[in-house]
């Protein structure tokens, strides 16, 4: 017998939809349709809006009573994760999130690794996404600048490591050059 969808299930499902709409790279990573030609917004304004949205979800979630054990686990897991996001933001980490493994610096490039490339439409989406990289990185830079204004900047070693990564990505045989060649080859084969 199929379990009936509860209010907590509905809220959880809506959260995934909202996160996919707000973060195109998340949507791509989970195979959720929409935003294939867009990039994430890492600006201070987007970070602040995310906090407002998370607080609204927490308030709704806290008002709901679990219908069963599954709901109880869902509610607790969501609250744990969402409260952690609030704590991360309040700590200022969102404004110094730069490192050599997993930060927006890698995410902006990494989304291209997981984006579909099988069709003409896929490549059109990738071209659109590529054109939005600059805006995404400018928003990210503004967030890092906000952290620096608060005297809360990334560690110098992390900064130098990310600079080295960016330098490598932008070489003649780096990611974006190779990506553009693949686009050209695909264009010749399928257009």
PLM features per residue range, with description:
Residues 1-191:
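N-terminal maturation segment of proteins
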């Amino acid at each position: 017998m199929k379990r009936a969808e509860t209010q907590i299930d509905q809220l959880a499902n809506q959260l995934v939809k909202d996160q996919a709409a707000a973060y195109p790279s998340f949507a791509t990573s989970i195979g959720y349709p929409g935003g294939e030609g867009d990039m994430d917004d890492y600006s201070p304004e987007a970070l602040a809006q995310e906090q407002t949205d998370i607080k609204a979800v927490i308030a709704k979630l806290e008002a709901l009573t679990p219908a069963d054990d599954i709901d109880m686990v869902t509610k607790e897991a969501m609250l744990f994760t969402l409260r952690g996001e609030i704590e991360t933001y309040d700590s200022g980490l969102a404004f110094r999130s730069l490192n050599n493994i997993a930060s927006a610096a890698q995410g902006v490039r990494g989304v291209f690794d997981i984006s579909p490339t099988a069709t003409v439409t896929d490549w059109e989406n990738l071209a659109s996404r590529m054109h939005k990289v600059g805006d995404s990185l400018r928003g990210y830079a503004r967030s890092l600048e906000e952290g620096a204004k608060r005297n809360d900047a990334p560690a110098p070693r992390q900064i130098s490591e990310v600079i080295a990564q960016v330098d490598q990505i932008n070489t003649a045989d780096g990611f974006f050059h190779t990506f553009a060649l693949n686009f050209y080859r695909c264009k010749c084969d399928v257009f």
